[in-house]
């Protein structure tokens, strides 16, 4: 039977570990460590002179291989060998030999560490290592170069630890080769005077170590200097004002813009908020608020439809679509004051309804006036993607911007896209009575979520009458004699009255001056930002959908705090935006909510994790409400109770998720959730019960066996 890759790798690891143990056993068993002393290498230098004179090439080869073996196995004595190399072969040849031998030996140790340990460490500490690996990807070469320049950091430890990161082998070798050169040269030069050296402390004097430490810091100083030079050069195109009219100008009054302006005003800075359309942005006017109002109306219809389950005979006579849409507008109007000019003006924000254009990093034209500002926050949001599908302009299509203007319900609605918006709209219109067809090119709806959670949602969409076509896409649209149809890639066609496009959103990055400033844009068409929400022009910040990485209202508000604080106080202290705990909810029935990683993501990251599940159909409150569909699934790290991620699919899953978001934010494990009193009967008890399942799965079996013996004894007493 063939050995699979996993078994073969395990076998190889055992062989390598056996070799390492053998080498260390021989080294210490035969007391070879006694030769790793200054006196011994002095003796060796004196006794090997004649041999080297006669067999110089062979002696150099033996020395080279010995150095590689000792450094590769992280055995003690590398410093002494470096001195010996200088004493035996002189500065030039000694430096040449040791420079390459030390780099090759270090790389061998690096590779052994990576092969033996990285998988285990990644599984055990994957979530923590993500941030380190991202830092290594950005500046790993600089980190390693600095560490190599400073001999204070143990040579062998650097090799082992860097093997656990994602730095490439090529980079590790090349940076080590260059970075260790200065320190190696010092010790090789000292080795040429080996007979005069009485202790290693004389070589590694405080002044020398300080000099090398300064040399190690030099790359960072140089990098900072280059960054400042580049920044100065970037700003050189414009003239900076001597004083400013505003501390901050915010462009866009969606969630990100409103929070940025609010924080700026709260700390008594002078801030102007510019919005050319409506306060509240997409979320209030065309996104979160109207869609949830629509979902509520659709849910009311569904509740009446199943009223006989509760012993109530009721029927729906008519669905007044115009009233449904009217209620949505009334909901928007009721919430509008929360985001109004009056409210924000009372907070100290100057609110202007106008078009803004960034003239330079410190000047913004707002209609006819030009204001100077210390900082700018771009919060211009995003708009629905309208793809260039042949024939699309010949048919009546809707987006999340235009859907809310409907006064007549489409009898046949075609929904393109299987993401959260597509699923929410498809289910809502199906419940309201439309014949709905949903097309998704992927093999699964809600592609970022686990298949078991999506299956629950998809089953409900199908039960509500949504015709779901997966693994397909529209090739073209046809308009003929007032009839509209979509021709699919597989040749089928779908007849419709309206088509709703839910194919994602693209950032609003044009039309307000960014192009002229050459602000960096990512491949995804987002404004490129750093960890502090700064764009490529440091005093211009970006938040929300225009910069990503998440297009969620609450993330835009979250980013806004960091942008505002960094803009106003960044000269004193800057804060990196924290994305570790980001909750998200899809408001279908049942809702699908998640925070942290999914099970699929844990598998892809090869983490050491556990999955614990609790089915909602076992929950008393769910049974009383006849809301038994779904489950709570928790991903924990290894055998610990540390929560890595939670997926909930259930009625009101978004409300249930808040407990886990808080727990993850403040590093509270499942034991804390289990130890918290949850009121009975509530849906929130599901969180306690899944924690109980985890506890049972991780109970100390050996201890419980002794406890059972104790109780048997007590019954006899």
Please annotate each region the language model reported:
Residues 246-273, 422-431:
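N-terminal Rossmann-like FAD-binding beta1-loop-alpha1 element of flavoenzymes
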Residues 251-253, 265-277, 289, 293-300, ...:
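Flexible, glycine-rich terminal cap/loop adjacent to redox cofactors
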Residues 288, 380-435, 439, 464-468, ...:
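Glycine-rich dinucleotide-binding loop and its adjacent helix/turn
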Residues 449-456, 537, 543-601, 680-702:
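A conserved FAD-binding loop/helix module that cradles the flavin
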């Amino acid at each position: 039977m063939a050995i699979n890759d996993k078994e073969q790798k395990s076998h190889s690891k055992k062989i390598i570990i056996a070799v390492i143990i053998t080498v260390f056993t021989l080294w210490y068993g035969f007391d070879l460590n006694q030769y790793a002393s200054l006196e011994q290498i002095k003796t060796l230098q004196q006794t090997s002179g004649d041999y080297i004179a006669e067999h110089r090439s062979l002696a150099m080869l033996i020395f080279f291989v010995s150095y590689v073996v000792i450094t590769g196995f992280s055995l003690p004595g590398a410093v002494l060998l470096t001195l010996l190399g200088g004493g035996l072969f002189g500065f030039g040849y000694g430096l040449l030999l040791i420079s390459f031998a030390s780099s090759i030996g270090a790389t061998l140790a690096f590779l052994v560490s990576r092969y033996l340990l990285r998988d285990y460490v990644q599984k055990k500490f994957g979530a923590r290592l993500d941030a380190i690996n991202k830092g290594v990807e950005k500046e790993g070469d600089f980190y390693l170069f600095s560490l190599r320049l400073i001999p204070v950091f143990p040579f062998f430890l650097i090799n082992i630890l860097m093997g656990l990161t994602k730095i490439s082998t090529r980079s590790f070798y090349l940076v080590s080769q260059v970075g260790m050169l200065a320190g190696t040269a010092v010790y090789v030069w000292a080795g040429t005077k080996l007979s005069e050296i009485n202790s290693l402390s004389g070589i590694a004097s405080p002044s020398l170590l300080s000099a090398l430490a300064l040399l190690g810091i030099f790359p960072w100083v140089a990098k900072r200097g280059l960054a400042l030079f580049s920044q100065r050069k970037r700003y050189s195109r414009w003239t900076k004002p001597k004083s400013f009219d505003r501390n901050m100008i915010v462009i866009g009054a969606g969630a990100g813009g409103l929070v940025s302006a609010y924080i700026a005003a709260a700390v008594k800075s002078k801030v102007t908020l510019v919005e050319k359309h409506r306060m509240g942005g997409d979320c209030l006017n065309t996104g979160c608020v109207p869609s949830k109002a629509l979902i509520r109306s659709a849910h009311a219809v569904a509740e009446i439809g199943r009223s006989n389950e509760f012993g109530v005979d009721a029927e729906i006579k008519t669905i007044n679509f115009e009233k449904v849409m009217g209620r949505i507008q009334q909901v928007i109007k009721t919430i509008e004051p929360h985001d109004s000019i009056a409210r924000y003006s009372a907070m100290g924000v100057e609110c202007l309804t106008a078009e803004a254009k960034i003239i330079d990093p410190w000047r913004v034209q707002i209609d006819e006036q030009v204001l100077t500002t210390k900082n700018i926050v771009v919060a211009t949001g995003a708009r629905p993607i309208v793809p260039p599908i042949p024939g699309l302009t010949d048919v009546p299509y809707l987006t999340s911007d235009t859907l809310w203007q409907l006064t007549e319900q489409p009898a046949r609605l075609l929904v393109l896209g299987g993401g959260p918006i597509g699923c929410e709209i498809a289910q809502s219109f199906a419940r309201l009575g439309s014949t709905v067809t949903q097309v998704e090119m992927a093999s699964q709806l809600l592609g970022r979520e686990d298949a078991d959670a999506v299956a629950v949602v998809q089953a409900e969409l199908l039960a509500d009458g949504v015709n779901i076509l997966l693994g397909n896409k529209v090739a073209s649209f046809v308009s003929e004699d007032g009839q509209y149809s979509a021709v699919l890639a597989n040749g089928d066609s779908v007849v419709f009255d309206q088509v709703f496009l839910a194919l994602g959103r693209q950032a609003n990055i044009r039309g307000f001056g960014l192009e002229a400033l050459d602000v960096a844009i990512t491949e995804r068409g987002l404004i490129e930002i750093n960890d502090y929400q700064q764009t490529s022009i440091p005093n211009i910040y970006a938040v929300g959908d225009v910069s990503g990485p998440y297009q969620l209202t609450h993330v835009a508000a979250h980013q806004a705090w960091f942008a505002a604080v960094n803009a106003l106080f960044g000269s004193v202290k800057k804060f990196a935006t924290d994305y570790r705990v980001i909750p998200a909810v899809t408001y279908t029935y049942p809702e699908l909510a998640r925070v942290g990683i999914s099970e699929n993501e844990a598998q892809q990251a090869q983490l050491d994790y556990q999955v614990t599940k609790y089915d909602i159909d076992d929950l008393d409150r769910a049974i009383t409400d006849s809301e038994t569909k779904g489950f709570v699934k928790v991903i924990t790290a290894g055998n610990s109770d540390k929560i890595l991620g939670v997926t909930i699919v259930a009625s009101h899953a978004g409300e249930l998720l808040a407990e886990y978001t808080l727990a993850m934010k403040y590093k509270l494990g499942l034991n804390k959730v289990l130890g918290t009193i949850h009121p009975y009967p509530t849906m929130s008890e599901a969180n306690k019960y899944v924690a109980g399942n985890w506890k049972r799965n991780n109970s100390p079996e050996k201890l419980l066996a002794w406890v059972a013996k104790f109780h048997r004894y007590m019954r006899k007493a």
